């Protein structure tokens, strides 16, 4: 099938992602979509490591998706730009950046498990960016699959207004198809239509008629309430047409007021086509989402708006960087407005640097289709960008805009890495630079005491895979240390009028700076961990020196006063100070700012913070006592216990430092019958006895 031209009619474009828990079947679902829309001639299976969207070697080995590939495909004359996102918690960054550039999403759930911890986390991220979603309850052929239970957990755990628009026909091995509550018919996949290309539309089976009526009524009530005209018609006993119902569901879905629920089994090729119809019918096109809002470069209060049309000036967001074996660095961009031709010059408005676009591609997983120009509403990969990193805005040089970037969490776990030979040292530096470009949650620093390179990430699996990629892609041989927890430090009380005078009078020009500050605990909006305010009056410190005090204080925050961990959640208020006409300089005030912060922090009841993980253990009832006892011994706090599909589920908050090696311990305590998942929850204060140990270790006592 020849690729059609990029549709200029944006109402027929859908940019959407597939998001879910690790094993709910996202990649399989995506593979089926590619098969039915005619890109793939043979269905790739995760089981045999041939899935198209999983294109790094490790993804095919581990059977999980790590980096999200963007793919363009067509369905019934609509263009679908699909992004497959990883479901494993250690790859939050991938999910986060994709949600930022998607207009809608399909949330895939495992029909047996319902809402799992990871689904909750991904769902919350999607709420943050207000992404409209439809839900697909997958794996309906599994033993123990329960559609109604899954829908219930969406309400209970996600607080989502989930509205079924399909019901399953048959269950487990006898799962045959779906009841369509909008058209009031059944779609069944009979016999072994090996790949499920064809299905029959039949009457609703008699044993489901009553249930279908009940759910149809619920659906119609929701639909009617959304529109006065429909409400009058419905209350007057008139039938609503299929188009009216679809129009209302679309309106409610785009407003994130409801989440339509569908079901099927991607692996058994049942229910995928109706899900594609639902993507087109209910998820927003680039025209349905609010215009992109940004600000003028270096003027954050000057708002700039770009509508999704080709007439507006060019604006795009770089949301992912990947290393391609042949082209080198590939930058994925979402174009929000205007058009741009390959080879033209644009500006990276975030950094104020000029960039020239090399070739432009529309991607199919890891194959490329070259295009001449990129236009509003679409997703492309581009080569040739030098300075652009994730979250940067590319724009028209004459009409610049900086779009809202993304926030990335700090690493919670670190390992030291040492190259085995001199030649590995160079390869290591190169590989770290390349990987850090691709993944903003991968952080690197040099440990000033040991001289080792320390890499940080979002979890053990995340770091395993990064180290694995260094070995494979960059041929680095390195020794990796034991994982270390990324502790932080903060203060608990306000200290006032702390002063510090920096002076040095030795022949020639001296140095002089005096500062007086208040230091207090600070909790900013999400992500903000520091604030600086100057209350200096009457020119007691010249205005040009005040930023130096701020910079010095921020430098001092890199190494805390207790054990050298970064200081967070502080507010510094500069009250007063003094300067010397000749001897004062920016440097002098920077040193004073740094020293006064250290002095104040030591007086402000400093404490150590540790990362706390939300852990969920699923275990047979016989081992329940052992599991809880073990979590308690790891300083865990049990949050809740519940029953799910015949097993017990324990939810607890446990410090990350106590969770190393948990896999093996849990396996031996439960004879391999329990499993667990954990996601980062928050930082909290370390108990005094543990704090002493951490300080002793850090100070080498």
Curated annotation (Swiss-Prot):
Principal localisation: cytoplasm
Stored Gene3D superfamilies: 3.30.230.10, 3.30.70.240, Elongation Factor G (Translational Gtpase), domain 3, P-loop containing nucleotide triphosphate hydrolases, Translation factors
GO MF, any single term: GTP binding
GO cellular component annotations of the record: cytoplasm; peptidoglycan-based cell wall; plasma membrane
Binding site for GTP: 20-27, 84-88, 138-141
PANTHER family according to UniProt: RIBOSOME-RELEASING FACTOR 2, MITOCHONDRIAL (PTHR43261:SF1), TRANSLATION ELONGATION FACTOR G-RELATED (PTHR43261)
Protein name: Elongation factor G
Protein source organism: Mycobacterium tuberculosis (strain ATCC 25618 / H37Rv)
């Amino acid at each position: 099938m020849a690729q059609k031209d990029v549709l200029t009619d944006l109402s027929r474009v859908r940019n959407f992602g597939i998001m879910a828990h690790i094993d709910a079947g996202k990649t399989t679902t995506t593979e089926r979509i590619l098969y039915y829309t005619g890109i793939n001639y043979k269905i790739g299976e995760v089981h045999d490591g041939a899935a198209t969207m999983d294109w790094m070697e490790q993804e095919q080995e581990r059977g999980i998706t790590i980096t999200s590939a963007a793919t363009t495909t067509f369905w019934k004359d609509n263009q679908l730009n699909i992004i497959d996102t990883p479901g494993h918690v250690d790859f939050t960054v991938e999910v986060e950046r994709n949600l930022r550039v998607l207009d809608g999403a399909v949330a895939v759930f495992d029909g047996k498990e319902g809402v799992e911890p990871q689904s909750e986390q991904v769902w919350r991220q999607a709420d943050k960016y207000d992404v409209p979603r439809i839900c697909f309850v997958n794996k309906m052929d599994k033993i123990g699959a329960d559609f109604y239970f899954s829908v219930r957990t969406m309400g209970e755990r996600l607080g989502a207004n989930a509205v079924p628009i399909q019901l399953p026909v048959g269950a487990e091995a006898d799962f045959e198809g779906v009841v369509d509550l909008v058209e009031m018919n059944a779609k069944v996949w009979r016999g072994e239509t090996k790949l499920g290309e064809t299905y029959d539309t039949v009457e609703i089976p008699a044993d489901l008629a009553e249930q279908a009526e009940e759910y149809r009524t619920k659906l119609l009530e929701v639909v009617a309430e959304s529109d006065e005209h429909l409400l009058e018609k419905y209350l007057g006993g008139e039938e609503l047409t299929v188009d009216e119902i679809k129009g209302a569901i679309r309106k409610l879905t785009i407003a994130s007021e409801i989440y339509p629920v569908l079901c099927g089994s991607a692996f058994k090729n049942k229910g995928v086509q109706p899900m594609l119809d639902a993507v087109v019918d209910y998820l927003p096109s680039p025209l349905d989402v609010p215009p992109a809002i940004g600000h003028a470069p270096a003027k954050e209060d000057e708002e700039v708006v770009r509508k999704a049309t080709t007439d507006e000036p060019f604006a795009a967001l770089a949301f992912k960087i990947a290393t391609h074996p042949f082209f080198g660095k590939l930058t994925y961009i979402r174009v929000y407005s205007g058009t741009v031709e390959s080879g033209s010059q644009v500006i990276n408005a975030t950094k104020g640097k000029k960039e020239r676009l090399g070739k432009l591609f529309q991607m199919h997983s890891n194959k490329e289709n070259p295009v001449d120009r990129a236009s509003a509403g679409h997703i492309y990969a581009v080569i040739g960008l030098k300075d652009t990193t994730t979250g940067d805005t590319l724009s028209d040089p004459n009409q610049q805009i900086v779009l809202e970037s993304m926030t990335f969490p700090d690493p919670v776990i670190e390992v030291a890495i040492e190259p085995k030979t001199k030649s590995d040292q160079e390869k290591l530096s190169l590989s770290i630079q390349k990987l850090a470009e691709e993944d903003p949650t991968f952080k690197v620093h040099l440990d000033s005491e040991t001289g080792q390179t320390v890499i940080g990430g979002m979890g053990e699996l995340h770091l395993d895979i990064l180290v694995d990629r260094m070995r494979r892609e960059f041929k680095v041989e390195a020794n990796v240390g034991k994982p270390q927890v990324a502790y932080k430090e903060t203060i608990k009380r306000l200290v006032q009028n702390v002063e510090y005078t920096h002076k040095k009078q030795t022949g020639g020009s001296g140095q002089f700076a005096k500062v007086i500050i208040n230091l207090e605990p600070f909790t900013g909006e999400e992500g903000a961990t520091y604030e600086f305010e100057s209350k200096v009056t009457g020119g007691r410190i010249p205005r040009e020196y005040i930023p130096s005090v701020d910079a010095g204080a921020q430098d001092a925050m890199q190494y805390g006063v207790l054990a050298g961990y970064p200081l967070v959640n502080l507010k510094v208020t500069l009250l007063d100070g003094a300067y010397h006409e000749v001897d004062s300089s920016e440097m002098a005030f920077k040193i004073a700012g740094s020293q006064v912060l250290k002095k104040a922090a030591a007086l402000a009841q400093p404490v150590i913070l540790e990362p706390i993980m939300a852990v969920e253990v699923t275990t047979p009832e016989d081992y329940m006592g052992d599991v809880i006892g073990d979590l308690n011994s790891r300083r865990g706090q049990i949050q809740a216990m519940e029953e799910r599909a015949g097993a017990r589920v324990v939810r607890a908050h446990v410090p990350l430092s106590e969770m190393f090696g948990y896999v093996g311990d849990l396996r031996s305590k439960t004879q391999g019958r329990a499993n667990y998942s954990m996601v980062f929850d928050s930082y909290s204060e370390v108990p005094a006895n543990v704090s002493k140990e951490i300080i002793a270790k850090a100070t080498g006592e």
